[in-house]
Amino acid sequence: MKTVTEFQNKNILVLGIAKSGYAAATLLQKLGANVIVNDGKPLAENVLAAELQAKGMDVVCGGHPLELLERNISLVVKNPGIPYSNPILVAAKEKQIPIVTEVELAYRISEAPFVGITGSNGKTTTTMLTFEMLKEGQKHPVIAGNIGTVACEVAQDAKENEVVVTELSSFQLMGVELFQPKIAAFLNLFEAHLDYHGTKKEYGLAKANIFKNQTENDYSVINADDADVMALSAYSKGQKVLFSTTKEIEDGACIKDNALYFKAEKVVEVDDIVLPGQHNLENILAAMSIAKLLGVSNEAITAVLKRFTGVKHRLEYVTTINNRKFYNDSKATNMLATEKALSAFTQPTVLLAGGLDRGNEFDDLIPYFKNVKAIVTFGQTAPKLVRAAEKAGLETIESVDTLDEAVVKAYAHSTDGDVILLSPACASWDQFKTFEERGDIFIQAVHKLI
């Protein structure tokens, strides 16, 4: 960890605990700050808050009182999930108090360079692929962010010869000031999180913060097939490395003659890749670009792609029952992810979909229903998905209350050779704490059929 003195004796407000807030507060105390921790959950129900209080921190729970800002606060470190419309953050901005997320703290203390990966879909798969390729290439990667360990915990132990590989959400990237990844990858942009950002434009600008501090000594890995991402890459001063699944890229990554190329050099045959889905070729090209920029050999990249079958809850194969294959794609929290999941299969498919209602309709899914023989909907968005399915002309449409019921109904509507796919196209928070919990419950329900 770098020697950092900028936080010594400063009053710093950590807003929202959870894993990232707990880690940030603990780090800041270690760096000599006077830490004030604030969380909306009452102290009696807040185990992490009680632990921080036991460490001698000033802990205020049960709301976000504006009076906290009267304590000569130098910096606010916010949980990514707390919107900037929260009154205490509005007041902090008015007082010109800097507001950051813990990823910013991680960057400031890290001896190791960062690779940052963002996009609406594919972040986790690309991050894991990048990590595996760098590991195979003996580049000493450590993984942090939305997957793995909280970034500022990883950064404390990261050495100069290591690489911190981190998946970054728009929520995290809104709170960066100095964060400067050596390599920044922007995979795609799809209309999402509008309840947080308001518009797709604001959402895209938040993600483009990944480029904010890059210089000509850094690299920006850009999806050349996404017009929005290409437009936002104008914010980067780094060296742009493009990737495409649809056209040849001489100075980047592309697919040609059934092989993946980087800077006109063949890296791996498509037939050697075991990860399913056309959309995953985009993720692979992005990860391959990062790996090649960091000096990983073609042999190491090929070795990873010959064994990497995917990430849990992302088109995860579950089991086969009576020649019906079950797939868990609970991470599909928006329509684009579900479109890509449906495009990955040519077999007749029974789709399970539904979840938190964020105000959007689902007509964009209709062209992707060509192989869908039945749909079972659940959650807040069930009526909207039913409407889209009716417009698509699906004959078998059901709505149920629970995911367990949905699995039973989906199996009942399937026949020999079908795919049964959970790809909700929605966030999970109407019925589940996380998409992981939703996926685990799906898997449990599937195994009950055996």
Curated annotation (Swiss-Prot):
Which positions are tagged coiled coil?
none
| Superkingdom assignment | Bacteria
Q: What is its main location?
A: cytoplasm
Its Enzyme Commission number(s) read 6.3.2.9
Pathway involvement of the protein, from the record: Cell wall biogenesis; peptidoglycan biosynthesis
Listed GO CC annotations: cytoplasm
Which reaction equation describes what this protein catalyses? UDP-N-acetyl-alpha-D-muramoyl-L-alanine + D-glutamate + ATP = UDP-N-acetyl-alpha-D-muramoyl-L-alanyl-D-glutamate + ADP + phosphate + H(+)
Q: Which GO terms describe its molecular function?
A: ATP binding; UDP-N-acetylmuramoylalanine-D-glutamate ligase activity
Its biological purpose is as follows:
Cell wall formation. Catalyzes the addition of glutamate to the nucleotide precursor UDP-N-acetylmuramoyl-L-alanine (UMA).
Q: Which family does it belong to?
A: Belongs to the MurCDEF family.
The name this protein carries in UniProt is: UDP-N-acetylmuramoylalanine--D-glutamate ligase
Instruction: Name the source organism.
Output: Bacillus thuringiensis (strain Al Hakam)
Name of the gene this protein is made from: murD
